[in-house]
From Swiss-Prot:
Mg(2+) 3 binds at residues 701, 705, 709. SUPFAM superfamilies: Terpenoid cyclases/Protein prenyltransferases (SSF48239), Terpenoid synthases (SSF48576). Involved in the biosynthesis of ent-kaurene diterpenoids natural products. Catalyzes the conversion of ent-copalyl diphosphate to ent-pimara-8(14),15-diene. It is an enzyme of class 4 (lyase). Changing residue 664 to I: Changes catalytic activity. Converts syn-copalyl diphosphate to aphidicol-15-ene and diphosphate. Keywords: Lyase, Magnesium, Metal-binding, Plant defense. This is Ent-pimara-8(14),15-diene synthase.
Length: 821
């Protein structure tokens, strides 16, 4: 990998040395974790002096609990929805409940303080608990049972009624409508609340304001939202209009409470089939949303990947994605009708190599798909972000579906930032997503950020209302996921630090630090490997990747002017001869250092690969070096002869190989798992993958460095395209250059789409783990050459490297931690 010419700024954190330039890097301090939060947290997570061990819970216990959740979705009961289902009467008899088991569950699950719902000991009362309690009280009163339960529930509501009036308190979706609707039912049955009548009137006034105000979205989105919270509207609802939103499973938006309300109001007897199935399956309580398998399991898979621990659950994830794929090809409503779920499914399926087209996303091609939905009414940034991210998984340059989705979703997200329409935490997430596209993010850096921002189970109980009418928190094993992610991140940092020390020793052993022109940056170069091939077991792949990145950067500097023509030709001949290099000899000590660094390192890599590859593969590494230096020599000769290629194609014939990804990817591929035959390296697929990766790197480099390279007398694809389209000198040079950059961006996008299609496709000669290396390299290149905000700076790159390799996690944990096991 060639570092950009603009990386001269890296000198800010390099120190001059009599033996060349090598970055300052002191031995890492002992591994540690910085925990923000209450006392006693370290003990509960077993993160004491030995941060890499689990004392409270063993690693296999953590994995077993997460694995159980992956295999079987555990539905979290909703007191609110259970109460509404409990109010459904037997057909033809309004005096008998159809679902007595729901009533029994309500009677058995009241808290000591008289409330229902998820009540946290010692925590303040929230609107969700108040809503659940009121719903359960109304349900019991409906059947004249549980008199003592009703009394204690009313007492709880009376003491905490002020919470319902507090506009600063977080609320479930549609609270002003659902709570006031229940309050209206309660007063109609003769229930008396120990509160002032003015407070009750205040609740109804809030509902009036809610019903009369202009919403975020359109008239269509408002109708959808009102159907979703229809149980809170009662006689005010147009029930025929609600039925337009009934799904194949006979529910209304998969909401048990909405389905129950339509039955109670006599407008949807068919919903009884949905409720019968739901209650018989769960035998008592019902969840806030059903079915939710796709929603829950996709979220689990996505979370495990974002936290960097998905490798522990590859079999379970494969089973889940197989199930999601079946839902996708059958166009199942559970998957396709929810914007966020559908977009996440598309992204995960495509990135895991499932053969799916973007046709399933066509329903979101217009902005109206968001504006006219509940998501638009509720200003649902999360669903919009998921849609935006999925639009970047393009395998065809002319995929207009994803292109249009990406265009309008990015625009709406940008408008949210400008108008400050989102919460601060969401705004930061939006800004990050717009700045770092999916194809320019590095996994380990992302994972550290995700770990540090991950919410514990206790935080989710407080903040987890999201888009649902009652607090949906699921049964996801948040604390176990966090503990496992923290443990594995710490363990990997220990490995990374040792590997980096070994690489610094390798630099000295190869004498590369004696070359005054060499830009030796082991930690930044190693960061590109650790941030993509992060599992600890890929140690040899990371080391081979880093060694070859350092070597190719040094050789590139040599061909860029630090070597004479005689020295350059000598190095090329030495690499061509390889084992027969003794016949040629060395024209200088510099050439000798460079050649032996390449030669000896390549032989060491090949020897380490023998147990995996069952053969000596040094010839493949040597050949990749030959193509690389041959291209570099051609470019050097052009520069020295002041020759300008006549076409971009002529320039790229040398510039693609000279970008020098061949040695790096070829060497790393030997250690990622599969045995690679001669046919793999000789295949058209492998050659095409390499050409695409090199092309991406070359174009990114040229677009960022063309001004500097023109001053140095070097040719560049941007300059050549501008010259060839300048109309014989007519027109503005600046305009020609801008047009050239636009064309190069188009070619870059096409190459990136082609690369992703090859990497994610099912089948092929090159094994998937090897294909992924090309995509990893592409992501590294986009990250390194990022144009926005001048991110590629000395401070920025070193901070990123330190974040992955050295800096401890900053984790916020609450005392309850892992006390559940």
């Amino acid at each position: 990998m060639i570092l950009p010419m603009s990386s001269a700024c890296l000198g800010q954190f390099l120190r001059a040395s009599p033996r060349g330039m090598i970055e300052q890097f002191n031995r890492a301090p002992p591994l540690r974790v910085s925990i923000r939060g209450a006392a006693g947290v370290e003990k509960s997570l077993g993160l004491g002096r030995n941060a890499g061990s689990q004392q409270g819970m063993q690693k296999n216990q953590l994995q077993d609990k997460i694995r159980k959740q992956l295999r079987e979705v555990q539905l979290s009961p909703s007191s609110y929805d259970t109460a509404w289902v409990a109010m459904v009467p037997v057909q033809g008899s309004h005096q008998t409940p159809r679902f007595p088991q729901c009533i029994e569950w309500i009677l058995q699950n009241q808290h000591d303080d008289g409330s229902w719902g998820t009540n946290l000991p010692g925590s303040v009362v929230n609107k969700d608990i108040l809503l659940c309690t009121l719903a359960c009280v109304v349900a019991l009163k409906r059947w004249n049972t549980g008199r003592d339960h009703i009394s204690r529930g009313l007492n709880f509501i009376g003491k905490n009624f002020w919470v319902a009036m507090d506009e600063q308190t977080i609320a479930p979706v549609g609270f002003n409508i659902t709570f006031s609707g229940l309050l209206n039912l309660a007063t109609g049955t003769g229930l008396e609340f120990p509160v002032m009548q003015t407070d009750i009137d205040g609740i109804f006034h809030m509902r009036k304001i809610e019903l009369e105000r202009d919403a975020y979205g359109t008239a269509s989105s408002r109708r959808a939202f009102m159907a979703y919270v229809s149980e809170g509207l009662g006689s005010l609802q147009d029930w025929d209009q609600v039925m337009a939103y009934q799904r194949k499973n006979r529910s209304i938006f998969n909401s048990p409470s909405a389905a129950a309300a339509t039955v109670i109001h006599g407008h949807n007897d068919s919903a009884l089939c949905y409720l019968d199935s739901l209650v018989s399956k769960l035998d008592g309580p019902v969840p806030v949303m059903y079915p939710q398998n796709a929603y829950s399991q996709l979220g689990m898979v996505d979370t495990l990947e974002k936290m960097g621990i998905s490798n522990n659950f590859s079999c379970e994830i494969s089973d889940i994605l197989d199930m999601i794929y079946r839902l996708w090809i059958h166009n199942e409503e559970e998957l396709m009708l929810d914007m966020g779920t559908c977009a996440m499914a598309f992204r995960l399926l495509r990135m895991h190599g499932y053969d799916i087209s973007s046709d399933g996303m066509a329903q979101f091609v217009e902005q109206s798909s968001f504006d006219d939905s509940i998501h638009g009414y509720l200003n649902d940034t999360k669903a919009l972000l998921e849609l935006y991210r999925s639009s970047q998984i393009r395998c065809l340059e002319d995929d207009l579906i994803l292109q249009d989705i990406g265009s309008w979703s990015a625009r709406v997200l940008q408008e949210k930032i400008s108008s400050k329409m989102t919460h601060k935490s969401e705004m930061l997430e939006v800004e990050y997503a717009l700045k770092f596209p999916v194809y320019a993010t590095l996994e380990r850096l992302e994972q550290k950020r995700n770990i540090e921002q991950f919410k514990t189970k206790e935080q989710l109980k407080i903040e987890g209302f999201k888009l649902l009418k009652s607090g949906y928190r699921g049964a996801i094993t948040h604390d176990e996921i966090l503990a496992l992610a923290v443990d594995e991140f710490h363990s990997s940092q220990s490995v990374y630090q040792q590997e980096l020390q070994d690489l610094n020793s390798w630099v000295a052993q190869t004498r590369l630090d004696e070359l005054k022109f060499a830009r030796l940056m082991p930690s930044i170069t190693y960061f590109s490997a650790a941030a993509t091939m992060f599992p600890s077991e890929l140690s040899e792949a990371r080391i081979a990747w880093t060694q070859n990145c350092i070597l190719t950067t040094t050789v590139d500097d040599f061909f860029d002017g630090d070597g004479s023509k005689e020295e350059m030709e000598n190095l090329v001949k030495l690499i061509e001869k390889w084992d027969g290099h003794g016949e040629i000899g060395f024209s200088s000590e510099c050439v000798e250092i460079l050649f032996y660094a390449i030669y000896n390192t390549s032989k060491q890599i090949a020897e380490k690969a023998v147990p995996l590859q069952k053969r000596n593969v040094v010839d493949h590494i040597a050949e990749s070096w030959w193509f690389t230096v041959r291209g570099m020599l051609t470019e050097a000769e052009w520069r020295m002869d002041k020759y300008v290629p006549t076409t971009v194609e002529e320039y790229m014939s040398a510039a693609v190989d000279s970008f020098a990804l061949g040695p790096t990817i070829t060497s790393a591929a030997l250690f990622v798992g599969p045995e690679l035959s001669e046919e793999v390296f000789r295949s058209k697929e492998y050659i095409h993958l390499m050409n695409l990766a090199n092309t991406i790197g070359r174009l990114l480099n040229d677009m960022q460095t063309y001004e500097k390279e023109i001053k140095m007398g070097k040719v560049n694809s941007v300059m050549l395209h501008a010259l060839s389209h300048s109309g014989g000198g007519r027109g503005s040079p600046e305009a020609s250059m801008e047009e050239a950059k636009r064309e190069m961006r188009r070619v870059l996008q096409g190459s990136r789409c082609d690369l992703l299609r090859l990497v994610t496709r099912d089948g092929g000669v090159v094994p998937p783990p090897c294909r992924k290396l090309f995509w990893f390299m592409s992501k590294v290149l986009h990250f390194v050459y990022m144009e926005k905000d001048g991110y590629f700076t000395a401070d920025g790159m070193m901070a990123s490297a330190n974040a992955v390799i050295l800096d401890p996690l900053q984790v916020t944990l609450l005392p309850s931690g892992l006390g559940t096991l």
